[in-house]
Amino acid sequence: MQTISGVLPTVLSPSELRSDDERTFQFDEEAEITTHLTESEDLRRLINETAQLGVRVDHIHDKTDQEIARLEKVIKEVTESDTFFRSCSGWFKTNKNFSDSESSSNTQLKSLSQLHGRYDRDWRQRLNKWFRKNKSKLALPSDNNLEEVNDDKVYGYGEDLMERGKTPYFSDIDDFMNGLNIISPLTPDDFENDDTLVKIDETCQIHSASEPEKTSISPTFGKNIKKELVTDDTESIISGPPLQENKKTLLKYRYVRTSLDMLGSEKSSSKNNSGGMFRIFHKSANFGDKNQENVPRVWDTLRNNLGREIYLLQGRFKKWTTKHQNLKKGQPCKDEDAVTVPLPSSDPGKETQLETKLCFVPEPGDQPLVQA
């Protein structure tokens, strides 16, 4: 009788592979080897389940009982997430009737191999991403206020709720602030934070003060107002409605005023910077090639001036709110209600002051307009 010591992965069951010391098996070469059909069948089933889910497991026969138990837990969680995802997508397919729902659903369901990372949170993010991508096809209410839904029927899937006509955003991931129509109380110090994002959009035409029908009667940025304009002799700020915020603050400004003296360049009076207006993200060969050493100083100047403009607009809004609550229609404001804001000057040792007066000008038959 000849004895051979070795590892037999096709015969041994996972329970027999507990440690390296027990991985040797004595058998008779001439005798028939009895195959454990039940244990081998369980091992093949585990391999098939991982293959169907797209999870590749190397050397599965060498796994210990603890590793195999962990793998089975992953398979169970992914399968439950897959079942919930199919129920959600199936409900939207039957109730919303958009044409290419079948292809988009199948494409997303084929990527199940990526769901075994951070199980619950990772799956929620991917489900959110799918609904956000297809929300234009889900026949949402045309009204800007998503909170008003005609049908209040709620469909519950476990601990998660889904309302008819709404995408299932989760509050711990997508913390949207819908209906925000006023500027957030920012100070110049907020721009030092890397988490704050200031987005400068493309340029647009600033409406002149001679068009009162395009200006709002309040400094709030309403949903039905196309353009809001706040002007005086030294500032010009325009913002597009509705002003919305996410985790990062998004502010839309068309132009940012800068001082020619603070640019520190003799050639800053070129046609691209005429009138003291600096155009954000506008590539200028004359400015970029010959004045590269002034670029950091230029952006510092823009940041400071942008902060002062926000501070000025913030003061105007607070002042207007106070007067609007206390004054009656047609009552003019007094001289002591002026807002004093420091402005940048060419001389660092000197500071100029700007006094802005907010007055109500009564007109017969019309609502009072805010003039700066």
From Swiss-Prot:
It comes from the Eukaryota. Residues 328-353 are annotated as: Disordered. Induces the SOS system when expressed in E.coli, therefore, it may play a role in DNA metabolism and/or in genome stability. This is Uncharacterized protein YPR078C. It comes from Saccharomyces cerevisiae (strain ATCC 204508 / S288c) (Baker's yeast).
